[in-house]
Design a protein with these regions (language model features):
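Extended hydrophobic/Leu-rich segments
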Residues: 12-15, 47-48
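Extracellular loop-to-transmembrane helix junctions
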Residues: 15-34
């Protein structure tokens, strides 16, 4: 039987493999951007390169923006969903054993039309800027540069927290798919992820520990 996964609305069957497939073009663009980063880093200073140093540096900037933004957006689809069909009966089809089919022609790019995917992408983007500035502070002995980086860390940390907390709060109060243990019926459960934290305190402790350690590392370096 066909079942369709739609963002926050219809019942669906999802697993990690189809979640990755649900954002196909996002993952492909992410992969391409990091390949572009590696090539640009290697060739920007080589003598006689055809594109010139500034072109490769521009590619590095593109990767620095596109990579974290889309990576966060793709991960967000694990919580917001993607538009595809699943037909598990195809697993027995030796000619075409593909169980996932797109619900539209965007092949995952439609994930960027969901504001919450973009919000987590922005959180990852600003966190990447924080980590980059922290690296400069801890690796380069230049007072003028480190002072600028400290200001950058503070500014980007504020933006990171705004977007990250917005996504976390929205996720905790959102409905999620659950299974009735008596009837095995799949239904939408209010506050699903918040309930998951309550029922699995170890996961909550790990999550909070990670957040606290990130903020501690930022504070220890900057203050």
């Amino acid at each position: 039987e066909m079942q369709r996964s739609l963002v926050g609305s219809e019942m669906c069957i999802r697993d990690s493999s189809t979640s990755f497939g649900g954002a196909y073009w996002l993952w492909m663009i992410i992969l391409f951007s990091f390949v572009l980063q590696a090539v640009s880093y290697e060739f920007q200073s080589k003598a006689g390169n055809l594109l010139g140093k500034k072109t490769y540096q521009t590619f590095l900037v593109i990767n620095g923006v596109v990579g974290p933004l889309l990576l966060g957006g793709a991960v967000a689809t694990f919580f917001t969903g993607s538009d595809f069909y699943i037909n598990k009966a195809n697993m027995t089809d030796t000619i075409m054993p593909v169980i996932s089919h797109w619900g539209n022609g965007w092949h995952g790019l439609d994930a960027l039309t969901n504001i919450w995917n973009v919000i987590l992408g922005l959180a990852v983007f600003f966190l990447a800027r924080v980590l980059g500035s922290l690296y400069f502070i801890n690796s380069i002995a230049d007072k003028e540069l480190t002072d600028k980086c400290r200001r950058a860390v503070l500014n980007n940390t504020i933006f990171f927290l705004v977007f990250f907390l917005a996504f976390v709060i929205r996720t905790l109060v959102s409905d999620g798919f659950a299974v009735n243990p008596d009837t095995l019926e799949v239904y939408m459960q209010p506050y699903k992820y918040f309930i998951n934290f309550i029922e699995m305190p170890v996961v909550l402790i790990i999550f909070l520990t990670g957040v606290v350690l990130v903020l501690f590392g930022i504070g220890k370096t900057v203050l």
